[in-house]
Structure formats: C-alpha cells, structure tokens
C-alpha cells in the first residue's frame, strides 16, 4: 500500500501482443527502456502463466497513462491481440485468477479507487468498464472484466 500518493484509479492495460507470441517481463522492460522510460512503466505485469511481476513500486508514479500516472496504479497483462493482431480478450485462466487476486488486494488498499482500461487505447480489447472498488464483491461474476467465465 502506498501512503505517499493518493490513488483513485487502477488501470488495466494489455501488452498488445498476439496470443501466439510470448512477451516476457524482460522483453517488456527492454521495450520500455527503448522508449526512454527509466524502467517498466507499469506497477504490475501478469504473464500468461499467471505470475504477477511487481514492476514499479506503488509509491512511485507509473509511466503508463499520460495525465493519470500521478494518481493511478498500472496493471498490464501479457497478450490482448488474437492471432491475426486484432484486439481480443486473450487472458488465460491463470491470468484471470491472478488479476482477480491482485485487484482484491489493491481494492483493499485503495477502496475509493475506480478500475478501468485506458479509454484511448485501441490496441487493447474493449469490455473493461469503469467501476469502483467498493462496488466489487469478488465472489460474484463481473462481465466488466472477462470473457466466457464472466469473472475477473
């Protein structure tokens, strides 16, 4: 939990990589360094196998959403594009479970926060609506965040 910044937004991003392509946390780091960032711009990265990699400390602003970095936590999941390069919910069951647990933890730490996807990110799939952490009862289905299982 971060005591130095007021967090009111949790943004869910995708790596905008094809479902058939692996994109490791090392490759994400190299990509962000090549773009001139000092490190990975997200606070957390979730790979296809459901591993949650802490990246940037929550106490530091991210580099994932211009104009929102100062008061947000950025989560990125590996994937987001189908085999043809079109936006799709490509999250594995392991990613969905990991995201659910991470969001439960973040919503405990930041109960006033809203959860959303970047509104100006055509590369990531649609379907993540904005909702408040207080409205989330993680035992129930939330089609806002996921596909066939209808759970985050």
Residues of each region from the PLM?
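Short, conserved "active-site rim" segments that organize catalytic pockets and cofactor/ligand binding
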Residues: 1-60
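Flexible, surface-exposed loop/gating regions in the mature catalytic domains
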Residues: 61-62, 83
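Basic/polar, cationic surfaces and motifs that engage anionic cell-wall
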Residues: 1-11, 15, 48-52, 68-71, ...
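Ligand-binding face of N-terminal immunoglobulin V-set domains in extracellular IgSF glycoproteins
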Residues: 75
